[in-house]
Amino acid sequence: MTRAAPAGARLRAARPWRGRSPAARLALACCLLLVVLTVLVVTRATQAVDQSVLDRLRPFDAWGEAQVGWSPWMDRLRPEHMYLLLGAVALGASLWRGSWWPAVLAVVLAGVSAGLALALKAAVHRTDPHGFVTDSGGAFPSGHTVALVVCLGGCLLVLRPRVRWWLWLLVPAAGALLTTSLLVAGAHWLTDVLGGALLGVALLAVGSRLRVRRLAHGVGGPTRRAGAAGP
């Protein structure tokens, strides 16, 4: 005779969505939205909206004062700079704490984000607003956006065991700056940026729950400073 499952377990089984952590819910929601958006992009259902935004922000494909003023931010916030920032912050945290786990966390976040972004770009193979397919494989999702969201958010995950809500405002603030520069310059479609943001947020939500993050903050395992070897 089998024992009946506790009431709490039965409730979680019946309502799996409610049994998940907020981070898991956020990751799942972003993944579902990304799948829907990808299908819409592939079927060109978003093309009219994308073209309307492009025509409004860069009419007649002209290069004017707005483009001159905003376009430098694309270079300042490009993926290489973002990944270098995350690497520098993680290396500093590793040296300060005497453990390589912060660096491992950064490598995981950077590697997975870059790999997934490139894979999705190659799968969708979308042209940019000027009709070209970039060397990275395509315009969707925006690699600039993925790198910015993951790396700025990753710095917070590396530095703080518990990130206060107002610190997260740094990510959308920088994201708004990058988005404006990408769209005004005509470097990306609007849905490219949205796709990059969804992928980046999903990866951050997952990364916040990884065991390697707990280890990076000395929770769940010894550090070198405590006399144990790192990874």
Task: Spell out what each predicted region is.
Residues 1-82, 121-132:
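N-terminal transmembrane-helix/juxtamembrane module of multi-pass inner/ER membrane proteins
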Residues 12-13, 67, 84-92, 150-154, ...:
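Hydrophobic, membrane-inserted alpha-helices
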Residues 50, 113-117, 152:
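Alpha-helical transmembrane segments of polytopic integral membrane proteins
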Residues 104-133:
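Hydrophobic alpha-helical transmembrane segments of integral membrane proteins
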Residues 131-231:
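Membrane-embedded catalytic cores of phosphoryl/pyrophosphoryl-handling enzymes
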Residues 20-31, 86-113:
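Interfacial segments of alpha-helical transmembrane regions
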Residues 2-18, 91-100, 155-162, 206-212:
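Structural signal for the C-terminal ends of transmembrane alpha-helices
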Residues 35-38, 111-119, 173-186:
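Aromatic-anchored segments of alpha-helical transmembrane domains
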